[in-house]
Amino acid sequence: MEGYGEAVFATEYLCKEYRHTVALRDVSITIPRGQIYGLIGENGAGKTTLLRILCGLTLPTRGRLLLFGAADAARQSEMRRRMGCLVDGPALYADLTAWQNLKVQCLQRGLNEADIAPTLQLVGLKDTGSKPAGKFSLGMRQRLGLAVALLGKPEFLVLDEPLNGLDPMGIQELRHLLEKLNREQGMTILLSSHILSELHQLATCYGILHNGQLLEQLTAEELDARCSKYLLVRTDNDRRAVDILRKMFPEAICQATVEGLRLFPVGNEAAATASGVLMENGLHVQELAVRSEGLEAYFTALVGGDSHADAG
């Protein structure tokens, strides 16, 4: 996650507690400008809580956050004018049409009504006519919520589970739209989703939340490397094995997971080399194999198999 320059949003040791429940615990996260950041986590991991804090819908219990470099609350409130947010589901007027819903938003936020028609066309709702939002399908309501978030051409778009309710074609269209906004307008996008296969096709960097803690931040390239071939090693002394493997493969990453040690990226020849050296150092090798996996399997291994995320 190094080398991306300015962050549009960053936190340091951010915590959120609700009476006896800890929703976020010491989360230090960085959202780089110009990236599509995928926030991964099972239900209850803290994704929505983090996004609600970012959008000013709730306050952290403690910790520090920066929004476009602003640290104080007054400046952050001003900076949120540069954001578009879809969190907690779209807040819509059921008896108003799509166009009327956006007009209300324009009046409330001091935006130009001339943006309404192109925004509706952008999300595929330009032909809904006089149909009230209350009669929209779940997918159409998600699209209208996205249109609300896109009004004013925000620099930073925050979306909580935007794929909910969309059919496969709708998911593909949304993915292409977000890629276009990022590519052509330089829009920074933060989105959470449990449909990991879609995130894997869209995001340029990732954060993995589990039980309120940020386990890892990594780029798409780093994730692809870890989701390709890796060497799985289990010994009678994994702590010592880590030291030996890091000396053998100084350019590789060695990671402890519930299934054993993972070394990546590696080639097929690494298994034979590692086995011999580990045994020469007096370790009992219980398992050593070259494997490969996808994002869901990587995520499950990282959080210990206690995942409700979906491969899509």
Residue ranges with predicted function:
Residues 2, 266-312:
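C-terminal coupling/interaction segments
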Residues 104, 118, 243, 276, ...:
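Surface-exposed charge patches
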Residues 175-265:
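ABC transporter nucleotide-binding domain
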Residues 7-9, 16-191, 196-210, 214-216:
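ABC transporter nucleotide-binding domains
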Residues 110, 124, 248-249, 282:
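Glycine-centered loop/turn motif at secondary-structure junctions
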Residues 2, 118, 219-222:
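Short, flexible cytosolic linker that couples an ABC transmembrane/permease module to its adjacent nucleotide-binding
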Residues 23, 112, 198, 240-241, ...:
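Short phosphate-engaging motifs
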Residues 70-73, 110, 236, 268-269, ...:
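Short, surface-exposed acidic/glycine-rich loop or hinge patches that mediate macromolecular interfaces
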